[in-house]
Amino acid sequence: MGLPADSGAAIRGRPVIEGEAVRAGGGSGGVAPGDPCPHRPAVIDCLVTHHPHLPRDRMGHRMSRSGRSLIVEAVRAVHGLDVTARDLVRDVHKRWSVPAYGLTVSVAHCDAYSAVALSAGARVGVDLQDERDRPYAMRWLGELLGRTEPATIGDFAECEALIKASHVTKETFAGVRLPAWQPGWRATNVPPYRVRSAHLGRNMHLALVADRSAPVRWWWRAGRAARATRTDALTLEAA
C-alpha cells in the first residue's frame, strides 16, 4: 500500500487449515491445459517458500526474486505444469493469471520468504509482512481504517492482499473496513471479497483474500531445490 516505513502490535492466531497432512507436491493440483472450469468448486493452493541465500544490496537489505519467477516455480511445484513467464498475464488491476490453465495467481515476498496463492475457481490475493518498528505507518493505517487505535502488521497484510485480489487501489482504499480477526474467512465491506490471516512463527504474517470462501491447501518448501509438501500445520517457526 506504500505505507510510510515505520510498526504495529502483532495479530495473534493460527490458520484454520483444511485438507490432509503432509503430502509431496508436483502435479496433485489437477489443473489441465485449457481448463478454466469457472463453475467447479474453488480451491486455493498457497505455497510458502524459504529463500535462505538471497543476496543483499549495498545497504544490507535482502534482495527478492522477481514475482514472475516465483509464480512460475509455484505453478510447477504445486501443479506440475511446465509454464514459463510468457504464460503469465496481468490485467488492468495488475492481477496475475495463467489463462491457459484457468489459474488466478497472487505473489508476495518478505525477507527470506515468499508466498504464492493459486486458484482455478477464485480470484485471490496474498501478502506477507514481518514485524518491524513503524508506529507512524500503523497509526496512519488505523485512521484510514476508521479506528481510534493503530493498525497491526496483520491488518497491513490483509489490506495489501485485498488490493491484490480486487479492483480496490491504493488511491481508492479510503472507506475500506476490515472485520475483527477470527479464524477462517471473514467478509469485508468490499463485496464479494473475504479475508483470512495467520501469525506464522514469531514475526511473520500471511494474509489471503478471495472473492468467495474456499478451502485452502497449504504447501511448504524449505528452499528452491526442495519439493513442495502439503501440510495442515503451516508454520515458519522451524524454518
Regions found by a protein language model. Give the residues of each.
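Core catalytic alpha/beta fold that binds nucleotide/phospho-ligands
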Residues: 2-239
